[in-house]
Amino acid sequence: MARGVILLAAGGTGGHLFPAEALAHELNGRGWTVHLATDDRAERFAGHFPAAAVHPIQSATMGSKNPIAVLGAFWKIWRGVRQASTIIGRIKPDAVVGFGGYPTLPPLYAATRRKVPTLIHEQNAVMGRANRALAGRVDAIAGGFLPQDTSAAGEKTVTTGNPVRPAVLEAAKTPYAASTGQEPFRLLVFGGSQGAQFFSDAMPGAIALLSDAQRKRLVITQQARADDVARVKTAYAALGVAVEVSPFFTDMAARMAAAHLVISRSGASTVSEIAVIGRPALLVPYPFALDHDQAANAAALAAAGGGEVHPQSTLSPERIAALIGGLMDNPERLAAMAAGAKSVGRPDAARLLADLTEAIASQKTVSDFKKGTQA
């Protein structure tokens, strides 16, 4: 017999849906029935989502400065609130959990009006706009990197971490082993759909500036946009470097576990996976990210000694070469960075998030939950 119903609200991007999916698996395993509220954009990601039902709900982004567009967005969101309220009345969830993005506004707002217990999960080190709008109304806030401080939001925040994929948990079992002497040095470079262009442009020139001995040690795995793959391969081939370049790697977690150094953007999922697996990283925040969330995520890992943060504007090929070459010649530093990253990894994030969800569903306060976890 099911313990009850939990409604998850996520949408817009797979980045918002992934932690929702991880929580759904955990809650299903505990006997809960899970429903998903999302928008049309995110429905394409939801094909394998472990939910009893998926409920498309209208929403809109509030990004325009055009007053007519703003009014239209408000009207769409309000219609979404009415849709969500009807669904909540029908399925009677014990709690509603949001994962950021504007599609979460209607279901979470409707839930607070109906006095249903509510929780939001923020993946980044700074709150996104939708979660900021909801923070004052919800009962609890779960954070990937958010602080538990004495502010109004901080007092009802529980730092659960960001749930990671099973493949990442498996990769985390591989301890870090520094490359010394003339051993191969495995370098993993990736930037995601928004950031790979910079690495495609900058990395081959930087590798060309390394010493011959250092280039001979390098084994590079680099993610690049499909349009860039051929030219990146050609540039590396001219240097005689062992490299694999592709737009996508299905075994990215295993490749991260095999890496001696990671160079990447600093989205919430990326930083969480680097921390759980425990690998040293040079983080280059995407400079055009909304709310500068990538810079804040990177700073959280750097504060633990797990990585170095380098703004893109400071990274000439000469600077990148100096950073890589210096670390290749300092395995002790790399091992210390790996340990620092591992120290802030949260492999139990899905369990902690499910624990908090159950507590909120049973009408417990965040204060009571924190006391219970510290007992």
Swiss-Prot record:
Q: What reaction is this protein's catalytic activity?
A: di-trans,octa-cis-undecaprenyl diphospho-N-acetyl-alpha-D-muramoyl-L-alanyl-D-glutamyl-meso-2,6-diaminopimeloyl-D-alanyl-D-alanine + UDP-N-acetyl-alpha-D-glucosamine = di-trans,octa-cis-undecaprenyl diphospho-[N-acetyl-alpha-D-glucosaminyl-(1->4)]-N-acetyl-alpha-D-muramoyl-L-alanyl-D-glutamyl-meso-2,6-diaminopimeloyl-D-alanyl-D-alanine + UDP + H(+)
Q: Quick check: keyword Secreted in the entry? A: no
Question: Keyword Cell cycle: yes or no?
Answer: yes
Q: Where in the cell is it found?
A: Cell inner membrane
| Topology in membrane | Peripheral membrane protein
Q: Which UniProt keywords apply?
A: Cell cycle, Cell division, Cell inner membrane, Cell membrane, Cell shape, Cell wall biogenesis/degradation, Glycosyltransferase, Membrane, Peptidoglycan synthesis, Transferase
Which amino acids does the record list as binding UDP-N-acetyl-alpha-D-glucosamine?
T13, G14, G15, N124, R165, S193, Q294
Q: One Pfam family of this protein, by short name? A: Glyco_tran_28_C
Associated pathway: Cell wall biogenesis; peptidoglycan biosynthesis
Q: What Gene Ontology terms describe where this protein resides (cellular component)?
A: plasma membrane
MF terms from GO for this chain are: UDP-N-acetyl-D-glucosamine:N-acetylmuramoyl-L-alanyl-D-glutamyl-meso-2,6-diaminopimelyl-D-alanyl-D-alanine-diphosphoundecaprenol 4-beta-N-acetylglucosaminlytransferase activity; undecaprenyldiphospho-muramoylpentapeptide beta-N-acetylglucosaminyltransferase activity
Tell me the InterPro entries matching this sequence: GlcNAc_MurG, Glyco_trans_28_C, GlycoTrans_28_N
Primary location: membrane
Q: What is its EC number?
A: 2.4.1.227
The Gene Ontology biological process terms listed for this entry are: carbohydrate metabolic process; cell division; cell wall organization; lipid glycosylation; peptidoglycan biosynthetic process; regulation of cell shape
Q: Which HAMAP family match?
A: MurG
Give the family from UniProt. Answer: Belongs to the glycosyltransferase 28 family. MurG subfamily.
Query: What does the protein in this record do?
Result: Cell wall formation. Catalyzes the transfer of a GlcNAc subunit on undecaprenyl-pyrophosphoryl-MurNAc-pentapeptide (lipid intermediate I) to form undecaprenyl-pyrophosphoryl-MurNAc-(pentapeptide)GlcNAc (lipid intermediate II).
NCBIfam families tied to this protein = murG (TIGR01133)
Name of the protein this chain belongs to: UDP-N-acetylglucosamine--N-acetylmuramyl-(pentapeptide) pyrophosphoryl-undecaprenol N-acetylglucosamine transferase
Organism of origin = Mesorhizobium japonicum (strain LMG 29417 / CECT 9101 / MAFF 303099)
State which gene encodes it: murG
